[in-house]
Amino acid sequence: MYSLEISLRYSPFPLSIQKKDYEDVKRIYNEIKDFMQGNNQNTHLIELSCEKVQDKLIAVVAKEVISVQIYEKSA
């Protein structure tokens, strides 16, 4: 299980989701990183879903993300 954790501007607590496949997490990571680099000039909404907690959904305005990280969650 892989976790993707994002930190938001003016928020002391990170948001995280879990995915089973590294490729899924890496794709989301790269998408968020592109938004952070300013490659997309429009205000975008990033929608994330978690595979560990079935009904966990997160929506974030992309320009508010200040950091993103991936790590493997060991059991």
Model-derived features with residue positions:
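Acidic, Ser/Thr- and proline-rich intrinsically disordered linker/docking segments
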Residues: 1-37, 71-75
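Short, mixed-charge low-complexity intrinsically disordered segments
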Residues: 38, 42-75
